[in-house]
Amino acid sequence: MGNDRYNAVVVGAGPAGSTAALMMARNNLSVALIERGKYPGSKNMTGGTIASMPFQQILPEYWNIQGIPLERRIVSDELWLLDNDSAVRIGFTGKKFGMAPYNKHTILRYKFDRWYADQAVKAGAKLFTSCLAVDLVYHKTGPLSKKVDGVMLE
């Protein structure tokens, strides 16, 4: 990264960090997206879900995007309340859950995070991998002494 200057530095290229970088880059801000792994998602061993309604606001009709690493459509949700010797199950489904716009999708984070960070890069963000942010650098004197001037990297 050197002494490059950015309007924003986002630490972590998971879904939240990539969303922040993508939205700022779309709005013509210079953004550095810092990821400690060799690539976004390289440190993830689990999956997750993408809820359709909020994600469509970021990437409209995302389920039609070529190459997006979605796994399965989720057509029902269940919530289990457990006690030592009993359980209550509450389920919800809808006739339209299996039709576009789909309710939600499962993802494997090691695939999805890499793809999603690439969307931020295509929008103009700069991705730095194998890069660990260890501290903030503050403006040293004056009324702006609490203003962040930079990020210290390991």
Model-derived regions, located:
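N-terminal Rossmann-like FAD-binding beta1-loop-alpha1 element of flavoenzymes
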Residues: 3-33
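Short, basic and Ser/Thr-rich N-terminal targeting/leader segments
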Residues: 4, 73-75, 129
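Flexible, glycine-rich phosphate/dinucleotide-binding loops
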Residues: 17, 40, 88
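Short glycine-/small-residue-rich flexible loop motifs, especially phosphate/cofactor-binding loops
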Residues: 21, 52, 117
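N-terminal FAD cofactor-binding segment of flavoenzymes
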Residues: 27, 37-85
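Feature captures the FAD/FMN-dependent oxidoreductase FAD-binding
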Residues: 79-154
